[in-house]
Amino acid sequence: MNLMEKLDALPADCFRSRRICFQRIRTEEDLFRMGLLSLPPEQQAAVNPLWFSLGRAYIAPEQNVPFLILQRVDERPAVIGFIQLHKRLGTEREALSWSFFIIPAFQGMGLGAEAAKLAISLLRSAMPEVPIHLSVERDNSAAQRLYAKLGFCLSRERDGDDLVYVLP
């Protein structure tokens, strides 16, 4: 089974944590809501652009699964970010990964760490035998600190100019 099928086989409660949930992007309304997300210019270089992530999902949908990140605000779900879980293509070894961001209004609240923990849980539940590798821009020290705190180790491998962190 591919990543999409494995994720689809998981129970709905696997996609929720204490404060957030991942909602699969399936409709035009979801695409519109995703299109409203933006980061300030100084943060844009640290993450894949949304068009690139959606392009990956279009080219290989079975291995690239996009989600909105939602949090309840005033009893209604608010879109606070985006995450795409994917199986890395074109690498020597099979690996799982993600691209994600939280919009500025919700940064600094621990929601990025919560999203990363939820992503780890989902990927481990879907494909426990496949390691998780994350590519990180050299100057994205916030992501590097977060991934180290979550148990990732810096690898000697590089993804172009990016550092690669591996969860053993």
Task: For every predicted segment, state its role.
Residues 113, 138-156:
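Conserved active-site alpha-helix within GNAT-family acetyltransferase domains
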Residues 133-144, 160-163, 168:
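Conserved beta-strand-loop-alpha-helix junction that forms the acyl-donor binding cleft
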Residues 125-135:
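Conserved GNAT acetyl-CoA-binding A-motif
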Residues 110:
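Glycine-rich phosphate-binding loop
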Residues 96, 128-130, 151:
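Short loop/turn motifs at secondary-structure junctions
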Residues 2-107, 116-118, 122-126, 156-160:
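Acetyl-CoA-dependent GNAT
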